[in-house]
Amino acid sequence: MNLQHHFLIAMPALQDPIFRRSVVYICEHNTNGAMGIIVNKPLENLKIEGILEKLKITPEPRDESIRLDKPVMLGGPLAEDRGFILHTPPSNFASSIRISDNTVMTTSRDVLETLGTDKQPSDVLVALGYASWEKGQLEQEILDNAWLTASADLNILFKTPIADRWREAAKLIGVDILTMPGVAGHA
């Protein structure tokens, strides 16, 4: 089972404060473990424009049709001071990993320098921090009913209102997560 370019959807019983009602986009999954970004937990009072200001990046030339007031996500509990930018192609930045045909993760400053300009990728999600699982850990959490999985949907990843992503991701597999009981069993 390879879950790269999939969503992990937290089950209602998962009460960890960081992962409760979370949707995690899996960027990498192999025999050594998994790495992902939470895509529905906005950091309070931090917008993309705030990150650019902090890094002294001024979009030149500024394309006013591109909004920079989008929230920055808490990507996970690890390396919360490190930026991860999920975006649609191109992937010609200094430090990019192509996750799928339509999704790229970049960690280098050069992608930030395109934000707010006509060079910006068409869809962008900025996160600080990431989540990771050791070998076999994620698979065990899935067996323990901590997570549902669904193929990632770019509309949910980039366009669905943040507050609706958990419910909408579950709908991808026909689940109304708001009516699920807190504890699931094994069939």
Curated annotation (Swiss-Prot):
Gene3D superfamilies documented for this protein? VC0467-like, VC0467-like domains
Transmembrane parts of this sequence: none
Q: Which domain of life is it from?
A: Bacteria
**Which Pfam family, an example, fits this chain?**
DUF179
Q: Which GO terms describe its cellular component?
A: cytosol
What the record says about family reads: Belongs to the UPF0301 (AlgH) family.
Q: What is this protein called?
A: UPF0301 protein YqgE
Q: Which organism is it from?
A: Shigella boydii serotype 4 (strain Sb227)
